[in-house]
Amino acid sequence: MQTLTVELGDRSYPIHIGRGLLDDPTRFAPRIRGKRVMIVTNETVAPLYLDRLKRTLGDFRVEAVILPDGEEYKTMETLNQVYTALLEARFDRKATLVALGGGVIGDITGFAAASYQRGVDFIQVPTTLLSQVDSSVGGKTGVNHPLGKNMIGAFHQPRCVVIDTDTLDTLPDRELRAGIAEVIKYGLICDRPFFDWLEANMDRLLARDPEALAYAIHRSCHDKAQVVAEDEREGGRRAILNLGHTFGHAIETGMGYGVWLHGEGVATGMVMAARMSRRLGWLDAEDLHRTEALIARAGLPVEPPPEITAERFAELMSVDKKVLDGQLRLVLLRGIGEAVVTADFDPAALDATLNQVGSGN
């Protein structure tokens, strides 16, 4: 087992990474301050892991709420199911919520914890690669709105993150590839040596080599923890973690939540950001080629859906958390391992990128 720490002063917390951690009560008990625990999970994960986690938390009074599975259920209505379960069971402010599932479960559970009785503790137990390397770390929580993804939410840090890499054994191939998109992102935004490693080891990751996956998870969490420690509430540098997300969220929203997986949208969004960076003269041709090639090798889409026109892209991108004072800020690349957040770009480069949708350029 390996442990990292997200350094946030008196709100610092550990990230435990290893095999069999779902069965290890010592990873959980020290971070639970009350006697009652509500596990929040979904219909897919519950049959696989809920009973195991209940046994591990046997020293506490444990209840569970099982939600429907899918991005299309990341809504206020689903969030209300969690509130109802907590209220009906008379949970108080000493409650601890445990998110057992992927990114949707983590985001909903975290937002419920941030808002129930004005804030209770929660623990992240991510079971997908995407949630293990990205959404479980950093305290972003929330739900979607029909007009925009993740537009309703709060920053609320977990008490700890417990990553049992054995849960990846039950992860569908498409979900694994979607998670690899977020892994590639770290190489692109701040860790060129990691990008080099990914080029050399992509086949091992796709084959689910345990050592390669463990290394990729640890390195990704390390990179994210450093960025979050520098800028917890995304006032500056943390926004680089959104590489590909403005384009990607537009794809997810425009196609209907759940049609494209989040990681698939991010993958295509990163390619679009790289192409725009090349148009601006910031990214050289070789780095663009390497970016496109690695994402394609991971089995991820590199072209946006032709159903979303340039005009529709622009409309969807205007509803984005990175819009400030009416100005769209984008995360772009000056090289592999060097991302920038900027509103200072030639709009013609963005227009050209959006108008190339479907052309492969």
Curated annotation (Swiss-Prot):
Superkingdom of the source species: Bacteria
Pathway(s) annotated for this protein in UniProt: Metabolic intermediate biosynthesis; chorismate biosynthesis; chorismate from D-erythrose 4-phosphate and phosphoenolpyruvate: step 2/7
Record EC number: 4.2.3.4
Note accompanying the cofactor annotation: Binds 1 divalent metal cation per subunit. Can use either Co(2+) or Zn(2+).
Top EC class of this enzyme: lyase
Residues the entry annotates as binding NAD(+): 69-74, 103-107, 127-128, 140, 149, 167-170
Record keywords: Amino-acid biosynthesis, Aromatic amino acid biosynthesis, Cobalt, Cytoplasm, Lyase, Metal-binding, NAD, Nucleotide-binding, Zinc
InterPro entries: Dehydroquinate_synthase, DHQ_synth_AroB, DHQ_synth_fam, DHQS/DOIS_N, DHQS_C
Primary location group: cytoplasm
Cellular component annotations (GO), alphabetically ordered: cytoplasm
Compartments (UniProt record): Cytoplasm
Family, per entry: Belongs to the sugar phosphate cyclases superfamily. Dehydroquinate synthase family.
Name used for this protein in its record: 3-dehydroquinate synthase
Organism expressing this protein natively: Thioalkalivibrio sulfidiphilus (strain HL-EbGR7)
